[in-house]
Regions:
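Positively charged, polar, low-complexity stretches
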Residues: 1-91
Length: 91
């Protein structure tokens, strides 16, 4: 089984808002630390990979945070694709 998420990071004014949304969408535990290290820890405890579709990677700190989230997802065997106007994967 694979978990599929669709994200428009331009809707999140801060990295914390992005992580709060990930916490909700992925049903992460209350102790989730709202950062990439905590995301790695929580997702590595699961068996199902995450498939992330990105409409927009956002700007500034949110874009940098999303880039780190993408790296975590890829490292754990998931995939990341861009479907919006940017049409390129985050760095």
């Amino acid at each position: 089984m694979m978990i599929t998420l669709f994200i428009d990071a331009s809707a999140y004014p801060s990295p914390r808002d992005l992580h709060a949304s990930l916490k909700r969408m992925l049903s992460l535990p209350d102790y989730y630390g709202m950062n990439a290290d905590a995301l790695y820890e929580c997702l590595s405890e699961r068996r199902e990979p995450v498939h992330l579709w990105i409409y927009s990677s956002g700007e500034g700190d949110t874009a940098r945070s999303l880039s780190t989230v993408c790296a975590v997802i890829r490292e754990l065997g998931g995939t990341v694709r861009t479907i919006g106007p940017e049409r390129s994967e985050p760095v």
